[in-house]
Design a protein with these regions (language model features):
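Structural motif
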Residues: 9, 140-141, 189
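Glycine-rich phosphate/adenosyl-contacting loop at the front of the ribokinase-like
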Residues: 1-65, 70-81, 244, 251, ...
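Conserved phosphate-binding/catalytic loop of the ribokinase/pfkB sugar-kinase fold
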Residues: 65, 91, 101-141, 146
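A glycine-rich helix N-cap at a beta->alpha junction
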Residues: 78-94
């Protein structure tokens, strides 16, 4: 059952798979065996965002391709535990996608491998399925990630625009963010990092404050660019902003930080909060996430988040 019927209803389409994260013990030595340990948990940009949105009190539904294997069952159990209504396309003879990341001893990403072939089967035709059409009708807001094929993202953007429903996107990677290029007419907001913004626009910003103008020239109505510990840049049709993220004592694991920022910012925007305050909530949740060994906060962290938002600086208007 969907919770909190009066809250915004958010449909998420995209990645829901297993994350395998290895952390190196000591300095990273390329082209050599490094001592370390592995941790395994459900992940995926869309799924991380969906679970954070549910923890923040929203009614959330998730659509994603999945294999008929133990990993698929683990993802389904995680959705149930998080309060996300799970509507997967299950391919019994296929393997659930997976993401393997190697992190330095300071929690920074060294390299990652994405085994995501199954997502290619989420074709535009899938959007015509009765269950998907019902979920689109149900939703007040839609979020997708770039694990979906380019044609599917474009078709979803057209559908969202025709239905008058806000659509936000998560870039996932510099290679995959290109899948949003043909969807800009129906895309209201795109969450990305600096490398993804450069790939999407085909340009480099000599000054981070140039990103709003560069991305508007690409047709984007709104977006946010995170840059690790440096200023977050965000814009919409009326704002161009820079926000200094709150300091983090110890970075444990950066996995999921961008998804957390997207979820908390979208949560605020969907509730009617203006962009300057929405990105403060996003920055607060991202800082909590990098301080944790998990990609998604527990529901019990909501009170901590409220307190932390109050400690985040006000954003600055860009000239």
């Amino acid at each position: 059952m969907d919770q909190l019927a009066g809250a915004p209803r958010i449909l998420v389409l995209g990645g829901a798979h297993m994350d395998h994260r290895g952390t190196i013990h000591g300095p990273t030595v390329p082209a050599a065996s490094n001592p370390g340990h592995f941790a395994h948990e459900p992940g995926g940009g869309g799924f991380n965002a969906a679970r954070n949105l549910a923890a923040l009190g929203h009614a959330v539904r998730m659509i994603s391709p999945r294999g008929g294997d133990a990993d698929g069952e683990t993802v389904a159990a995680a959705a149930l535990a998080a309060g996300v209504v799970d509507h997967p396309f299950v391919y019994l003879d296929r393997r659930t996608p997976g993401y393997t990341a190697i992190l330095s001893e300071t929690g920074d990403l060294v390299i990652a491998l994405a085994d995501m072939d199954l997502y290619r089967l989420f074709t535009p035709r899938r959007l015509l399925a009765r269950t998907v059409r019902a979920d689109l009708d149900w939703a007040s807001h839609i979020l997708c990630d770039a694990n979906l094929p380019e044609g599917t993202i474009e078709a979803l953007a057209h559908r969202a625009r025709d239905m008058g429903k806000p659509l936000a996107g998560i870039a996932i990677s510099p290679a995959k963010v290109l899948r949003f290029r043909r969807a800009v007419s129906g895309l209201d907001f795109l969450f990305m990092n600096g490398a993804e913004a450069a790939a999407f626009s085909g340009r480099e910003a000599t000054n981070a404050a140039d990103w709003p103008a560069i991305l508007r020239d690409c047709g984007l109505k709104g977006g946010a660019i995170t840059q690790g510990g440096r200023d977050i840049i965000a814009f919409d049709e009326t704002h161009s902003l820079a926000l200094t993220p709150p300091p983090v004592g110890t970075v444990v694991d950066v996995t999921g930080a961008g998804d957390a920022f997207a979820a908390a910012t979208l949560s605020a925007l969907a509730g009617g909060t203006p962009l300057p305050q929405a990105i403060r909530q996003g920055a607060a949740l991202a800082s909590l996430t990098v301080s944790s060994s998990h990609a998604v906060i527990a529901e019990t962290m909501k009170d901590v988040l409220v307190t932390l938002v109050g400690l985040v600086d006000q954003p600055r208007n860009l000239a």
